[in-house]
């Protein structure tokens, strides 16, 4: 619990005509509460709650919803730095759109400063945090800076079984579909979010993202916004593994399997190299490695969730996180898929031509 980050949040300028109540929940029973925070709690300026067990984000957010009674619920991460007029921006939005489902502010990340943060930026890992700058409405958003209308939320809550990831997408899309409307973007409600762990590797985070996405894929309100897709690198390697016995029975040497595996991996690396050069205008092997590592960590998380749950028939399926229309068209292409297909084809031709 970092009082240097929390105190500015707890002392934001309060808009006229609104009652503001802070609820600070710590999901760590062993936390040492700073004296300044404890003092605010003892004076009744905030409500401080400490979970008896480490219960996860869904339980913690649900507890906050239940402990509060305001018409509007603002979720803020505890490590953000808010703009001084954050609450005024939300208050103005409430006055202008009192029947809104909720509002999504902008969560800015600092400029990338190393290979990990550059990889996260290039891979799109932080794009959804600032989507309010470019879209008027959204079906969901990260809960780092997001407000919900309690009356429209009703009795919907975060699913507590989603302990690894996907809980924000699941609830917010369910709430959006249940009300037949989306959350309004609020580009004036800005907070700054530091790079996770001071810019160190986020492989575990990407794994959790993938795992959570595969878990919620099975839910009807999510699945109808998914479609068949070309296999990613991990899925392609798994399919090759399944085919290996038949390849060997056909008399094809095992070295061919190894060669195909190498081509699959090399195509991924070369594609990321081209992405790095095209987008960031630099060709850095460490950056290419971090892009590949973090992207594939998310794919491994997705695959591992399917494998653990016996849902391998959901391989080669992607969620349309824009949630634009149900049953999106399958096998959609983008330039990087086309580039990867082209590179794979060239590598296959070069390999077998040499043979």
Where are these regions (language model features)?
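Short, well-formed alpha-helical segments that are part of the catalytic scaffolds
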Residues: 1-13
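A conserved acidic beta->alpha catalytic loop
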Residues: 25-35, 53, 80-81
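Glycine-rich, basic loop-to-helix element that forms the pyrophosphate-binding segment
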Residues: 51-68
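Short aromatic/hydrophobic "clamp" motif used to bind/position activated sugar donors
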Residues: 73
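Conserved donor NDP-sugar-binding/catalytic core segment of glycosyltransferases
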Residues: 85-117
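Short, flexible, basic/aromatic active-site loop/helix in glycosyltransferases
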Residues: 105-106, 120-138
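Catalytic donor/gating beta->alpha subdomain of glycosyltransferases that bind UDP-sugars
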Residues: 164, 169-225
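Membrane-embedded multi-pass helical conduit in multi-pass membrane proteins
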Residues: 237-309, 346-355
């Amino acid at each position: 619990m970092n009082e240097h980050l929390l105190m500015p949040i707890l002392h934001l300028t309060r808009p006229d005509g609104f009652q503001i109540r802070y609820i600070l929940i710590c999901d760590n029973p062993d936390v040492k509460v700073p004296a300044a925070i404890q003092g605010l709690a003892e004076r009744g300026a905030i409500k401080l709650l400490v979970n008896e067990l480490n219960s996860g984000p869904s339980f913690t957010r649900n507890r906050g919803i239940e402990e509060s009674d305001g018409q509007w619920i603002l979720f803020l991460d505890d490590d953000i730095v808010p703009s001084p007029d954050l609450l005024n921006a939300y208050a103005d939005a409430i006055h202008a759109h009192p029947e809104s489902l909720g509002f999504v502010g902008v969560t800015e990340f600092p400029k990338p400063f190393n290979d990990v943060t550059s990889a996260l930026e290039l891979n799109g890992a932080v794009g959804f945090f600032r989507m309010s700058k470019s879209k008027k409405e959204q079906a969901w958003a990260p809960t780092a800076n997001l407000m919900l209308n309690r009356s429209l939320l009703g009795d919907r809550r975060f699913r507590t079984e989603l302990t690894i990831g996907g809980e924000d997408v699941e609830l917010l899309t369910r709430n959006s579909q249940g009300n037949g409307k989306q959350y309004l973007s609020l580009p004036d409600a800005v907070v700054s979010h530091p790079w996770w762990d001071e810019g160190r590797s986020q492989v575990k985070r990407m794994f959790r993202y993938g795992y959570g996405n595969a878990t919620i894929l099975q839910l009807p309100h999510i699945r109808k916004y998914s479609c068949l897709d070309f296999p990613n690198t991990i899925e392609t390697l798994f399919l090759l593994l399944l085919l290996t016995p038949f390849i060997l029975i056909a008399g094809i040497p095992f070295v061919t399997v190894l060669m195909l595996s190498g081509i699959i991996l090399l195509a991924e690396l070369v594609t990321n190299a081209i992405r790095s050069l095209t987008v960031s205008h630099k060709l850095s092997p460490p950056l290419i490695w971090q892009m590949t590592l973090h992207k594939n960590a998310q794919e491994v998380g997705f695959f591992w969730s399917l494998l653990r749950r016996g849902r391998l028939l959901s391989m080669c399926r992607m969620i349309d996180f824009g949630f634009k229309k149900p049953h999106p068209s399958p096998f959609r292409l983008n330039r990087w898929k086309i580039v990867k297909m082209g590179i794979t084809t060239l590598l296959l031709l070069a390999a077998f031509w040499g043979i």
